């Protein structure tokens, strides 16, 4: 997972809860002042659907959860496994009370159901770390309850990385810290899985910004064609990630064949192994597209060139197209001094790994099956009516 040090303000609309007879509920979206995502590779370190709206600030997607009656907005992250939040009297909240007022913080003394387990937690990221102690409390997300949910409470400060609270929903061996497992345990959903859909980065704050995570169900209105279910591939070093095998091309340039790709919603960019990234740069040169360096490590180019940019990925026979429009990050969304005609490239050098973050994930609809160790993907669709299908058995292909 990764987060940025830049701060933006996004105006977000309120969304009313869906009618109960549809079998799903929506958490409201609100105006937030959030930290935007940036290049930071992590250390490798009633049985109905429950739908929580995600809100997009640049490309950092957040979801709201209530812990002991206290509302928290945290960045959703398939690349880590627990939720951690700021304690109300943490050094971070003392340094920047406005952010804690905006995103929320957790005060154990305000909840009669809060319990300090006395067990420490520590998560190392590419920049910084989060640590503290695990607590349990009653959680509510999208109107559904998960009693006794376990999460981390951080009393530290921003010097350890400067990122917002993180809602880890990745591969997890401890069911007590998995929100989807706890929703299943409480009878809110039948299957321990969730589907995710990300909107276009340019739609942040508009009525069309309808990113969502749906626990226990899929939304067939968010993809075109059929879903392809593929097994998760184990990674070395004991780390657990949503890793799958894929091949990739940029235009007519073959980048890689049958290599490991990590799907990580807590990462903004698409990172390619160095050799693959250099081949991509060569492909840009062939298209007469030149990247210019900007502060913060961003690489800019004219947005008018987006129509030339096209990736094709193959996942076990399922072909996914990622366009320049999918990959582009509006330059003036990151830096107000950048002209609106400039886009920042959403692909960068990943060193020895392929790490596919939000600039890839918004081109697909993805389903993460934690029970069966599988991922299902399809090409994303926009503008279709929502159609929620409760999953009690196999994910439909």
From Swiss-Prot:
Question: What EC identifiers does the entry list?
Answer: 3.4.23.-
Provide the active-site residues from the annotation: 77, 264
Disulfide topology: 93-100, 303-343
What positions does the record give for glycosylation?
88, 310, 314
Protein's cellular compartments: Secreted
Tell me, what is an example of a GO biological process annotation in this record? fungal-type cell wall organization
Please name the Pfam families in this protein's record: Asp
The Peptidase A1 domain is annotated at 61-378
Please list the GO terms describing molecular function.
Answer: aspartic-type endopeptidase activity
**InterPro entries (alphabetical):** Aspartic_peptidase_A1, Aspartic_peptidase_AS, PEPTIDASE_A1, Peptidase_aspartic_dom_sf, SAP-like
Cross-referenced SUPFAM superfamilies: Acid proteases (SSF50630)
Which residue positions does the secretion signal occupy? 1-17
- One GO cellular component term: extracellular region
Primary place of residence? secreted
Keywords on this record?
Answer: Aspartyl protease, Disulfide bond, Glycoprotein, Hydrolase, Protease, Secreted, Signal, Zymogen
Q: Which family does it belong to?
A: Belongs to the peptidase A1 family.
List the protein's name.
Acid extracellular protease
């Amino acid at each position: 997972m990764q987060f940025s040090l830049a701060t933006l303000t996004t105006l977000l609309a309120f969304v009313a809860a869906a009618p109960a007879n549809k079998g799903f509920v929506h958490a409201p979206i609100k105006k937030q002042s959030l930290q935007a995502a940036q290049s930071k590779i992590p250390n490798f370190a009633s049985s109905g659907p429950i739908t929580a709206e995600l809100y997009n600030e640049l490309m950092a997607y957040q979801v709201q959860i209530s812990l002991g009656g206290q509302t928290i907005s945290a960045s959703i992250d398939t690349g880590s496994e627990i939720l951690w939040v700021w304690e109300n009297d943490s050094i971070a909240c003392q340094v920047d009370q406005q952010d804690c007022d905006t995103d929320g913080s957790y005060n154990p003394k305000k909840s009669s159901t809060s319990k300090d387990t006395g067990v420490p937690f520590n998560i190392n990221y590419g920049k910084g770390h989060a640590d503290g102690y695990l607590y349990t409390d009653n959680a509510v997300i999208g109107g559904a309850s998960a009693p006794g949910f376990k999460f981390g409470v951080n009393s530290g400060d921003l010097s350890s990385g400067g990122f917002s609270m993180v809602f880890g929903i990745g591969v997890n061996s401890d069911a007590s810290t998995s929100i989807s497992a706890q929703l299943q345990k409480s009878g809110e959903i039948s299957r321990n899985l969730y589907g995710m859909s990300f909107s276009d980065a340019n739609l942040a704050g508009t009525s069309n910004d309808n990113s969502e995570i749906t626990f226990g169900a899929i939304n067939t209105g968010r993809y075109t064609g059929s879903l392809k279910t593929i097994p998760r591939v184990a990674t070395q070093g004991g780390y657990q990630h949503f890793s799958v095998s894929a091949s990739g091309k940029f235009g007519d340039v073959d980048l890689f064949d049958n290599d490991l790709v990590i799907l990580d919603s807590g990462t903004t960019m698409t990172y390619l192994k160095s050799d693959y990234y250099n081949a991509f740069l060569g492909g840009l040169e062939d298209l007469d597209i030149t990247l210019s360096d900007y502060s913060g490590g961003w690489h800019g180019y004219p947005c008018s060139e987006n129509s030339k940019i096209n990736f094709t990925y193959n996942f076990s026979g399922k072909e996914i197209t990622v366009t320049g429009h999918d990959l582009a990050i509006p330059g003036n969304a990151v830096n107000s001094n950048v002209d609106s005609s400039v886009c920042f490239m959403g692909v960068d050098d990943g060193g020895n790994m392929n790490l596919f973050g939000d600039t890839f994930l918004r081109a697909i609809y993805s389903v993460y099956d934690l029970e069966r160790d599988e991922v299902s993907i399809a090409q994303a669709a926009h503008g279709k009516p929502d159609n929620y299908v409760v999953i009690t058995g196999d994910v439909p292909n």
